[in-house]
From Swiss-Prot:
Family per record: Belongs to the arginine N-succinyltransferase family.
InterPro entries: Acyl_CoA_acyltransferase, Arg_succinylTrfase_AstA/AruG, Arginine_N-succinylTrfase
Source organism of this protein record: Escherichia coli O139:H28 (strain E24377A / ETEC)
Gene Ontology biological-process annotations: arginine catabolic process to glutamate; arginine catabolic process to succinate
Protein name: Arginine N-succinyltransferase
Keyword Acyltransferase part of the UniProt annotation: yes
Length: 344
């Protein structure tokens, strides 16, 4: 059975293996053991209440409960940009016009932005390619909403998610090549590594501070603004069906889109509810997959179960209860895994 649980110190080698499979561009999951160990330690201290809000971040892993294999990782940053500036480009417009010459040009323009400062962030979503099946990707991504719903007071009103931009298998980023490299004088992979290992001072020091006309970029770079890496397209679709939208903010490195949503408008958060759980044999039927989570802050767990999402009393097997660290009579959080398709 696949289970979401909080990260542990012993997971560092498994996270290193996951990091080696990302192909670059996932800034928050660098193949650097010291950085990953520090990330785990920060998550543990967050759960223990030892960090200020500006440093808090939760990390979860997807584990096969039978073998102990760690198949994926996901995380939430509580409030971005309160210690180090959190940069985006806002894609806007500058108008140049002359009535005398009968000239009017509305030019797409990139503006350096810190507009998302203080927002909670969904980040570090990666599922081992060998495990991309049977709803694992949905479980990994949406489990975070169950945690946010259960512990709403820990998070801010807006949630953002930076989507991985277009990068090829050799680490070539058209957006970086046309823009970032001119100011940072380094390859994308180097900048990505520095950022992922916490060495972010260079961003503030070297970033262009003035608006940038996108027409000055190569056509290849212009074409990838706000576009996602092919492997990230499913993750984008998942978030958009939960209510997230692209509001013309992009990543400063690869040009990938930043999606955002008010936390209380996220479908899985808004529609999740608490039900009593009982042990038994679940009823047979054509039921949809649902997310089921306990309400235990320190020992949080999420699994998938096929059940009636409108039930008031959820029947789970002994194995499911054990995976959730629950007992009969406990209350668990339940929501349909995917939004119901509207029929005409």
């Amino acid at each position: 059975m696949m289970v979401i649980r909080p990260v542990e110190r012993s997971d560092v080698s498994a996270l290193m293996q996951l990091a080696s499979k990302t192909g670059g561009g996932l800034t928050s999951l660098p193949a650097n053991e010291a950085t990953l160990s520090a990330r785990i330690e920060r998550a543990i201290k967050t759960w223990q209440g030892e960090l200020p809000k500006s440093e808090q971040g939760y990390v979860f892993v997807l584990e096969d409960s039978e073998t102990g294999t760690v198949a994926g990782i996901c995380a939430i940053e509580v409030a971005v940009g309160l210690n180090d500036p959190w940069y985006n480009y806002r894609v806007g417009t500058l108008v140049h016009a002359s009535k005398e010459l009968n000239v009017y040009n509305a030019l797409p323009t990139l503006f350096l932005s810190n507009d998302h400062t203080g927002s909670s962030e969904l980040c570090t979503l990666f599922l081992d390619p060998d495990w991309r099946k049977e709803g694992n990707g949905y479980l990994l991504s949406k489990s975070r909403f169950m945690f946010m719903a259960a512990f709403r007071d820990k998070f801010n009103d807006k949630v953002v998610a930076e989507m991985r931009g277009v990068i090829d298998e050799h680490g070539y980023s058209p957006f970086w090549q046309s823009l970032g490299k001119r100011f940072f004088s380094m390859d994308f992979s180097r900048a990505d590594f520095l950022c992922g290992t916490g060495q972010k001072a260079f961003i503030a020091e070297l970033m262009p501070k003035h608006p940038i006309y996108t027409h000055f970029l190569s056509q290849e770079a212009q074409d990838v603004i706000g576009q996602v890496h092919p492997q990230t397209a499913p993750a984008r679709a998942v978030l958009e069906k939960e209510g997230f939208r692209y509001r013309n903010y992009i990543d400063i490195f690869d040009g990938g889109p930043t999606l955002e949503c008010d936390i209380d408008r996220v479908r899985a958060i808004r529609k999740s509810r608490l039900v009593e759980v009982a042990e038994g044999q679940p009823a047979q039927g054509d039921f949809p997959a649902c997310l089921v989570a306990n309400e235990n802050y320190h020992h949080f767990r999420v699994v998938l179960a096929r059940t009636d999402p409108a039930t008031e009393r959820l029947i789970l097997t002994a194995a499911q209860l054990d995976a959730l660290k629950c007992h009969a009579g406990d209350r668990v959080r339940l929501v349909r895994l995917c939004a119901e398709e509207k029929t005409a």
